[in-house]
Design a protein with these regions (language model features):
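Non-heme Fe(II) oxygenase catalytic core, chiefly the N-lobe of the double-stranded beta-helix
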Residues: 9-28, 36-194, 207, 211-215, ...
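Glycine- and charge-enriched low-complexity intrinsically disordered segments
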Residues: 237-238
Length: 238
């Protein structure tokens, strides 16, 4: 694929709740927080160990370990969507030699709600892992932020997330137009080390290749929102 392609060095200046330099949130839709999750790694390890291996993505709800890891992540999300930020979905991804996959370029377009209520603009509906998913009006997705917390190192050969910087500003992108958007905007490989956190504007175009190494790649992904849903719909939360 032509266009700009580069890797973000995983050890840039800054830690905690200060993003590393090199990216502009408004223009790029991404921010990198080196070492931001170091203090919660024991809880993340316990969370990951409580689930069997060989599961591509486990949707989390009500797990006690989440209570220990969410406050610091919510503070980061609040930088981008305001003080009312709250976690609304959590997924544990676990790539390993026994469970490996690739993911084509796409935008995240669904949310998880407590129960189905017919509201104009919401649909189609579906279930994943027993949870109710629905595609909302895209303006809701545009006001969300996603954090990915790295439990393992993610060098270039361990399937880093690939993003098209700036694609979050393009609205809902029709499937046939995605390749041209990626070609035009270029690709950023989001390298990371254990304990690093990446933040993204939820609508950003992203993809991931299969891992070509033999290492495990566990990532906790949490979506955050600050707005209420219309028509008595409720976020399920985590």
């Amino acid at each position: 694929m032509a266009g700009r392609s580069k890797g973000m060095e995983p050890r840039l200046a800054g830690a905690g709740c200060a993003p590393a330099p090199g990216l502009d949130w408004q223009n790029d839709g991404a921010a990198f927080y080196p070492d931001a999750a170091l203090s919660i790694l024991p809880h993340l390890d316990a969370l990951a160990a409580s689930y069997p291996e060989r599961h591509a993505g486990i949707r989390l709800h009500g797990h006690p370990a989440l209570a220990a890891v969410l406050p610091s992540l919510t503070r980061i999300a609040g930088h981008y969507i305001g003080p009312e930020a709250r976690p609304v979905r959590a997924i544990l991804f676990d790539k390993s030699p026994g469970t490996n996959w690739s993911l084509g370029w796409h935008q995240d377009r669904t949310i998880v709600v407590r129960e189905r209520r017919e509201v104009p603009g919401f649909g189609p509906w579906g279930r994943k892992a027993g949870l109710i998913h629905v595609e909302p009006p895209f303006a809701i997705i545009e006001r969300m932020t996603t954090l990915r917390v790295h439990i393992d190192d993610v060098p270039a050969n361990n399937a880093p997330l690939l993003i098209a910087p700036g694609s979050h500003r393009l609205g809902r992108i029709a499937e046939p137009e995605i390749p041209a958007a990626v070609e035009r905007l270029g690709i950023l490989a989001c390298l990371a080390q254990r304990g690093d956190v990446w933040a993204y504007a939820t609508p950003i175009l992203h993809a991931s290749a299969a891992s070509v190494g033999h290492a495990q790649r566990r990532v906790l992904q949490v979506d955050f929102a600050a707005q209420m849903l219309p028509g008595n719909l409720e976020w399920l939360g985590v």
